[in-house]
Amino acid sequence: MSSNSINVEARAELAELIKELAVVHGEVTLSSGKKADYYIDVRRATLHARASRLIGQLLREATADWDYDAVGGLTLGADPVATAIMHADGRDINAFVVRKEAKKHGMQRRIEGPDLTGKKVLVVEDTTTTGNSPLTAVAALREAGIEVVGVATVVDRATGADEVIAAEGLPYRSLLGLSDLGLN
């Protein structure tokens, strides 16, 4: 959770929307390979008009003390989160996309969007489990010489991502945890 002051009512509304739209009960295999009796399909919220607006607003509030020019992460989970932040009220913040690997054709880029040379960036994710997705994006950005100031996520599953991200020397913030969704 963020140490910054965020709108409590907006956060509660987002939690309700995610419970309604994105929590799917039934056995699933997570990206970590572990089994769970529910799945949080946050894309159902990040691609929902009202929830997306709340996500953009709240993540801007949660990271207001971090200095960054652009926001993005590993495609696909990070894409709508980044654009929600980009379109939220406030200063101009560009968005970018990090591919899992560089394209084999065209410009053969791994990082798409505006030129990030000399820019500071925030890496985002819809849901963190192991921290591998945001750290894959962090590695690609660092390899390209881009400074990453932190990682932020909509929902943290409390399965160690915070520790893995901290081990990379990055601060980490989340809007919601499992208890906020009635899943602890």
From Swiss-Prot:
<feature type="binding site">
    <location>
        <position position="157"/>
    </location>
    <ligand>
        <name>orotate</name>
    </ligand>
</feature>
<feature type="binding site" description="in other chain">
    <location>
        <position position="100"/>
    </location>
    <ligand>
        <name>5-phospho-alpha-D-ribose 1-diphosphate</name>
    </ligand>
</feature>
<dbReference type="InterPro" id="IPR023031">
    <property type="entry name" value="OPRT"/>
</dbReference>
<comment type="function">
    <text>Catalyzes the transfer of a ribosyl phosphate group from 5-phosphoribose 1-diphosphate to orotate, leading to the formation of orotidine monophosphate (OMP).</text>
</comment>
<dbReference type="GO" id="GO:0044205">
    <property type="term" value="P:'de novo' UMP biosynthetic process"/>
</dbReference>
<protein>
    <recommendedName>
        <fullName>Orotate phosphoribosyltransferase</fullName>
        <ecNumber>2.4.2.10</ecNumber>
    </recommendedName>
</protein>
<comment type="pathway">
    <text>Pyrimidine metabolism; UMP biosynthesis via de novo pathway; UMP from orotate: step 1/2.</text>
</comment>
<keyword id="KW-0665">Pyrimidine biosynthesis</keyword>
<keyword id="KW-0328">Glycosyltransferase</keyword>
<dbReference type="InterPro" id="IPR029057">
    <property type="entry name" value="PRTase-like"/>
</dbReference>
<keyword id="KW-0460">Magnesium</keyword>
<keyword id="KW-0808">Transferase</keyword>
<feature type="binding site">
    <location>
        <position position="103"/>
    </location>
    <ligand>
        <name>5-phospho-alpha-D-ribose 1-diphosphate</name>
    </ligand>
</feature>
<feature type="binding site">
    <location>
        <position position="105"/>
    </location>
    <ligand>
        <name>5-phospho-alpha-D-ribose 1-diphosphate</name>
    </ligand>
</feature>
<dbReference type="InterPro" id="IPR000836">
    <property type="entry name" value="PRibTrfase_dom"/>
</dbReference>
<dbReference type="InterPro" id="IPR004467">
    <property type="entry name" value="Or_phspho_trans_dom"/>
</dbReference>
<dbReference type="Pfam" id="PF00156">
    <property type="entry name" value="Pribosyltran"/>
</dbReference>
<feature type="binding site" description="in other chain">
    <location>
        <begin position="125"/>
        <end position="133"/>
    </location>
    <ligand>
        <name>5-phospho-alpha-D-ribose 1-diphosphate</name>
    </ligand>
</feature>
<dbReference type="GO" id="GO:0019856">
    <property type="term" value="P:pyrimidine nucleobase biosynthetic process"/>
</dbReference>
<feature type="binding site">
    <location>
        <position position="99"/>
    </location>
    <ligand>
        <name>5-phospho-alpha-D-ribose 1-diphosphate</name>
    </ligand>
</feature>
<feature type="binding site">
    <location>
        <position position="129"/>
    </location>
    <ligand>
        <name>orotate</name>
    </ligand>
</feature>
<comment type="subunit">
    <text>Homodimer.</text>
</comment>
<dbReference type="GO" id="GO:0000287">
    <property type="term" value="F:magnesium ion binding"/>
</dbReference>
<comment type="similarity">
    <text>Belongs to the purine/pyrimidine phosphoribosyltransferase family. PyrE subfamily.</text>
</comment>
<dbReference type="GO" id="GO:0004588">
    <property type="term" value="F:orotate phosphoribosyltransferase activity"/>
</dbReference>
